[in-house]
Each structure stands twice: as C-alpha cells, then as structure tokens.
Swiss-Prot record:
Binding of Zn(2+) 1, residues: 14, 16, 100, 248
Record's protein name: Dihydroorotase
Cofactor binding: number and manner: Binds 2 Zn(2+) ions per subunit.
Pfam family, one: Amidohydro_1
The entry's keywords: Hydrolase, Metal-binding, Pyrimidine biosynthesis, Zinc
Pathway linked to the protein: Pyrimidine metabolism; UMP biosynthesis via de novo pathway; (S)-dihydroorotate from bicarbonate: step 3/3
Organism encoding this protein: Pseudomonas putida (strain ATCC 700007 / DSM 6899 / JCM 31910 / BCRC 17059 / LMG 24140 / F1)
Length: 348
C-alpha cells in the first residue's frame, strides 16, 4: 500500500465561511486544500440577492492568503419572497452558481428560510429555465417529527415531488445522512446529486452520545445510527458520480458549542481531505477518492475539473486543540486526536 496519494485538486461543494473578522481564518483553511467552494448564504442577514452575493464574494476574496487563487462560488438564500427576476439576475451575475433551500428553522440562521416549498415554485421554475442548481437542506422541521426521522420524512413529503415537478432542474441533496437519502439519489434521474460530509462517513450517533455528550460532534442533520453510516460509505466509495464532496464545515466559537444549548456544526475545513482519506482507506477505496473529491462535483455543475494536484502522505500528526476564530477560538473536529494522513505542503 502506497504511503503517498496524489489527486487532482479537489473542490468543496458545501462550506460555511461565516463573515467579518473570522474570514481570514476560515478562508485560509479552505484555500489550503480546495480550489473552489460552494459558499453557504446563511449569514445574518442572509445573502438574498446578486448584489449581496457580490459584496460577500469580495469580502471572501479580500481574505484569501497571499498568492491564493481560491474561487468562491456564491449561492442565494431562498425565501418565501424571492422572485424569478432575482434568480435571473443572480444567474446573469456570473458568480452565483446555485440557490439554497433552507426549510425555516432547520439549522443555523435558517429563520428566514422557506415556510412552504410551494411558495418558491415560481423561483424554482426560473432556476430550471436558466440552469441554476437547487441546493436542499432536506429535513422537515415540524416539532412533532423526531430529529432522527426528519430527513426521511423530507424525502417522502417534498423531495420526490420537487424532482418530479421540475424534471430538468439540477438538485443537490446536501449533506445526506441516511440510507434512505442514498437510495433516493441513486435511483433518481441524473440531474439529482448529493454531497456527503467527512463526519457522516467517519462517525455515527454513538460517537456523539455514548460515554458522555460530545458537543463538537453535533451537527444538522444529526449523526444517525451505524447502518446509515455504512450506507453513506457505500455510496461515497461506489464511484457513482452522483455523490461528491461537501464538507459542511461550519465553525462556531468554543463558547457557542460547549454550552447548555450548543450550536450545530462541525469544523473540518482545516483537515477535510485528510479525514475523507481515512474514511476511504477504511473501505480500501482510496482509488475512488479522486472521483468523489475532484471529478464528480465539477461534472455535476458543468465546470472543468482542476488541473493542478495535491499530495497526501501517510504520516500521523496531532490535530490542534483549538484554532483562531476572530477574537475567539474554534474547537475543530478531531481536536487533539491523531490523523493518519497529512497534506503535503507545496514547499515541503
């Protein structure tokens, strides 16, 4: 088994960079590995127009490390009031690549999200017409639905209907967490894809709950049982081009995670490709990592794959206990733990 793994440079098709003073830290971490990333729009206030997306993009570009060519791919936040004209203007901008459906209340800063999918059907129709993908946080949010069942219920109540009603629309079922979602995407038409996070490949709910609550494993959609983890590993390592890398790296300051009511999100951008390599190695599927990380996503979005490469070496290193996050700190996933793969820096 080789101790070096060279891949075409990957992209991250789902990441949260936040805003303001933290951007130099979050942008630096993602730019270390990835050439491009789909930037989540759930700021406060959210990114709802092409102009707001353009302003956020400029702040991200200004935060890039010296010499970095990292490219942020911007996303609109869908609300009940978004119009087809907003969609067309975003497409015409040249820098907005998708629009995001957050069911109201589903996750961090989703209070402005969609209260009924029917409300945005005119906007979705415009997206299908102009070729803009719909990115979906696929969970129902009604309080009577168990948190572990919300993804499956979303498929049954909404996802099938959207895919059937808009047969030409590209749809990304984001951060899937269940065997139900993996099966749905596998059986859906070619215009339906999915991202999978590193944490959902490496962990299940036992890691979060057994022996004490581990808040840094808490994310939404929540970690599920082992059988779902196995199904996600099957999908990610299958070579099926419908499945591609999306970290959903989502930083929160330490005090916001280690709290009586902690925030949802795992910070993985600092070592994401290293974690994916561990997951694929568990399946003896390192030969499938380049497709998942570097080829399937660009193909789905109709973009060229990157031409430069990265190299991972099999070398243990210890993840930092914390990382700078503006004036605060963020505790990354795997803090203080050993990782088995290390990204070889260009000057190494």
């Amino acid at each position: 088994m080789s101790d070096r793994l060279t891949l075409l440079r990957p992209d991250d098709w789902h990441i949260h960079l936040r805003d303001g003073a933290v951007l130099p830290h979050t942008v630096g971490d993602v730019a270390r590995t990835f050439a491009r990333a789909i930037i989540m729009p759930n700021l406060v206030p959210p990114v709802r127009t092409a102009n707001e997306a353009g302003a956020y993009r400029e702040r991200i570009l200004a935060a890039r490390p010296a010499g970095s060519r990292f490219e942020p791919l911007m996303v609109l936040y869908l609300t009940d009031n978004i119009s087809p004209e907003d969609i067309r203007a975003a497409k015409a901008s040249g820098f907005v690549y998708a629009a995001k459906l957050y069911p109201a209340g589903a996750t961090t800063n989703s209070d402005s999200g969609v209260t009924s999918i029917d409300n945005i059907f005119p906007a979705i129709e415009a997206m299908a017409e102009v070729g803009m993908p719909l990115l979906v946080h696929g969970e129902v949010t009604r309080s009577e639905i168990d948190v572990f069942d919300r993804e499956k219920r979303f498929i049954d109540e909404h996802m099938r209907r959207v895919v059937e009603r808009f047969p030409t629309l590209k749809v990304v079922f984001e951060h899937i967490t269940t065997s139900d979602a993996a099966q749905f995407v596998t059986e859906a038409p070619a215009n339906v894809g999915a991202t999978i996070t590193a944490q959902h490949l490496l962990y299940n709910r036992n890691h979060m709950l057994v022996g004490g609550i581990r808040p840094h494993f808490y994310c939404l959609p929540i970690l599920k049982r082992n059988t779902h983890q196995v199904a996600l590993l099957d999908a990610a390592t299958s070579g099926n081009p419908k499945f591609f890398l999306g970290t959903d790296s989502a930083p929160h300051a330490r005090h916001a995670k280690e709290a009586a009511c902690g925030c949802a999100g795992c910070y993985t951008a600092y070592a994401a490709i290293e974690m994916y390599a561990e997951a694929f190695e568990q399946r003896n599927a390192l030969d499938k990592l380049e497709g998942f990380a570097s080829l399937h996503g660009p193909a789905f979005y109709g973009l060229p794959a990157n031409t430069d490469t990265i190299t991972l070496v099999r070398e243990e290193w210890t993840a930092p206990e914390s990382l700078p996050f503006g004036e605060q700190t963020v505790v990354p996933l795997r803090a203080g733990e050993k990782l088995r793969w290390r990204l070889l820096e260009k000057n190494a």
